[in-house]
Amino acid sequence: MLYIVPTPVGNLEDITFRALRVLKEVDLILAEDTRTSSVLLKHYDIHTPLKSHHKFNEHETSDDMAERIAAGMTVALISDAGTPCISDPGFMLVRACVERGVEVQCLPGATAFVPALVNSGLPNDRFYFEGFLPQKKGRQTRMKILAEQTHTMIIYESPFRLVKTLEQLAEYMGADRRASVSREISKLHEDTQRGTLAELANHYKQTPPKGEIVLIVEGANS
């Protein structure tokens, strides 16, 4: 059995009783970064063996791990924060398990974009998840496509690229397109700023952002 286990995006209390039980009972935990995950596991007195599974090794390890799970091992997959496979490693392992007929269970739990979307004040009955934009090749093409998207858009971004992204989106979508920026979700300094793309770009030029960021942008003709 492979369990996909969401972990807190900020506050360590944002984890379910079921997730804690699974992490204690499985034979092995696969973690995106064992150092980061060790903090959570130590906090909850979980001593299950831990092994790295990240974007740099999942191409080589997913098939072997799926074979071990098929042979009877129970494994939990976690990421540094939030739900694995959502802009995080895990898809290749899930696919390898599915191809072998291995049962996969994804537990419900934390993910950063849901509170950011709800807090944005923008329409959320339909939305489009973009995740991380390309940093170089294909970036302008994605911007053009997003400019025509009619549903509210969800974009993950680095604090170091946020101003550039806001300025580029304003260029393709118009400076008056409404948006929100949520950062440090569920952490001590959680913050959401709302305004137009131009206003937000100007704000973060003057106040450089820190922490993990979710950008929500209203759809065309909203």
Model-inferred region functions:
Residues 92-149:
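Class I SAM-dependent methyltransferase SAM-binding "motif I" and its flanking Rossmann-like core
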Residues 152, 156-222:
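A contiguous loop/helix-start segment that scaffolds small-molecule binding in enzyme catalytic cores
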Residues 52-59, 132-134:
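Conserved helicase motor
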Residues 54, 62-111:
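Glycine/small-residue-rich loop that forms an oxyanion/phosphate-binding "nest" at active or ligand-binding sites
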Residues 1-2, 71-76, 152:
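Loop/turn-to-beta-strand initiation segments
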Residues 23-29, 101-104, 152-153:
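Short active-site oxyanion
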Residues 1-55:
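Glycine-rich, flexible N-terminal cofactor/catalytic loop recognition
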